[in-house]
Regions:
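Catalytic loop of the DD-peptidase/beta-lactamase superfamily, centered on the K-T-G motif
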Residues: 1-154
């Protein structure tokens, strides 16, 4: 396994990587529960149904999903405006004890913190493994999806 120079990482990333390296930390105990670690590039693991992980799609499909949450796409809307308002109402905020970053959480979606590049008071969405991101902003009508071709560690 390649060693990572923690000093070369930005401070927030350095902290989470140091916590992950500590077998006694809550971060390590929470994220290293699968042995051997999953390889999200293997078709067998992509076919498995695992909550909160392995949502596999194209960037266009992810953006269209978020667009259908905030309005009609091809005549279909997934959530009513009332349900969306309830799902995006802030329920909690604070420091994530696992990832060691500030978070805001709605009933059904993540909410951006003010330092997130996609921040808007009305935006909602979730980052994903490896740097993927899906979000929407009902106030502007923007829906966005970014995914990678492969999941790479580090």
């Amino acid at each position: 396994m390649a060693r990572i120079d923690l000093n070369a990482l930005p401070e927030p990333m350095r902290e989470v990587m140091a916590a992950y390296a500590d077998p006694a930390s809550l971060t390590r105990r929470s994220l290293a529960v699968v042995t051997p670690p999953l390889d999200h590039n293997r078709p067998q693991e992509q076919a498995a149904e695992m909550p909160a992980t392995n949502g596999i799609c194209t960037a266009r499909a992810l953006a269209r999903f978020y667009a259908a949450l905030i309005g009609e796409v091809d005549g279909h809307r997934i959530l009513t405006a009332e349900t969306l308002a309830a799902a995006t109402a802030e329920q909690a905020r604070g420091m994530d004890r696992i990832l060691r970053v500030p978070v805001r959480i709605g009933t059904g979606f993540g909410l951006p913190t003010p330092d997130a590049f996609w921040y808007s008071p009305t935006a909602f969405g979730f980052p994903g493994r490896g740097g993927s991101l899906g979000f929407a902003d009902p106030a502007t009508g923007l829906a966005f999806g970014y995914v990678m071709n492969r999941v790479e560690e580090g």
